[in-house]
């Protein structure tokens, strides 16, 4: 089953949202307090964590995103875009014609971070603040095209923080709803075609359902449990944790494709965050690599070297 985004008026006869059988295929980002909550989660996870310094640094980035969101609102009518594009992600990260709005977000993030980040990070911020619009666009294009080695690691995290906030603002403006149709490729975000950072088994109105969380636009999309989120096979799945069976963070590995993705359980800890808890459990990543599995996701605060 794949998911595509269509305008409300194009929706066919789907189960009513009030129906017991209705499963929301897509949860668009709710930006109210998202970054504030994420920052608080980073701060909580930093306690007694071997990566405490970096988690506290990540908390500052989330707070800067919250401030940039507040100071740089974005409201767009995306109905024409949804009507023109069928069968593809409406905000595809590689083809969507982005505006310079993300430059303003980056400038705001840089201004907020200058006084709170370590000296080593200040150099990168200063260099970014002096970069031309062309240079910024070149770095953004490289990251969005998965060409991570073209952007130095000390700059990529800030560039992506601005791009992610921009895409999240766009996704939050989508007036259509998601419609489920047969197909493949649920391993990518149906809104922007980026990859997940982790998956989460939720509580509340979506109790027990597993959603993948986009590492770019913050959208979540439904993928059934007991299925590999990378190859969609079901035969060789295993679950790993560092603590116990009741751990709120586990790794779901697939023996068929050799990949793994973190899976978070809100019923075990209602405060889990798709980005923060993934980053705070790097020791689990090391364990999975020792077992011979390759990560099928990217954390927006920790890009690969190549």
UniProtKB/Swiss-Prot annotation:
<comment type="function">
    <text>Necessary for formate dehydrogenase activity.</text>
</comment>
<dbReference type="InterPro" id="IPR056774">
    <property type="entry name" value="FdhE_N"/>
</dbReference>
<protein>
    <recommendedName>
        <fullName>Protein FdhE homolog</fullName>
    </recommendedName>
</protein>
<dbReference type="GO" id="GO:0008199">
    <property type="term" value="F:ferric iron binding"/>
</dbReference>
<dbReference type="InterPro" id="IPR056797">
    <property type="entry name" value="FdhE_central"/>
</dbReference>
<dbReference type="Pfam" id="PF24859">
    <property type="entry name" value="FdhE_central"/>
</dbReference>
<dbReference type="GO" id="GO:0051604">
    <property type="term" value="P:protein maturation"/>
</dbReference>
<dbReference type="InterPro" id="IPR056796">
    <property type="entry name" value="FdhE_C"/>
</dbReference>
<dbReference type="InterPro" id="IPR024064">
    <property type="entry name" value="FdhE-like_sf"/>
</dbReference>
<dbReference type="Pfam" id="PF04216">
    <property type="entry name" value="FdhE_N"/>
</dbReference>
<dbReference type="GO" id="GO:0005829">
    <property type="term" value="C:cytosol"/>
</dbReference>
<dbReference type="InterPro" id="IPR006452">
    <property type="entry name" value="Formate_DH_accessory"/>
</dbReference>
<dbReference type="Pfam" id="PF24860">
    <property type="entry name" value="FdhE_C"/>
</dbReference>
<keyword id="KW-0963">Cytoplasm</keyword>
<comment type="similarity">
    <text>Belongs to the FdhE family.</text>
</comment>
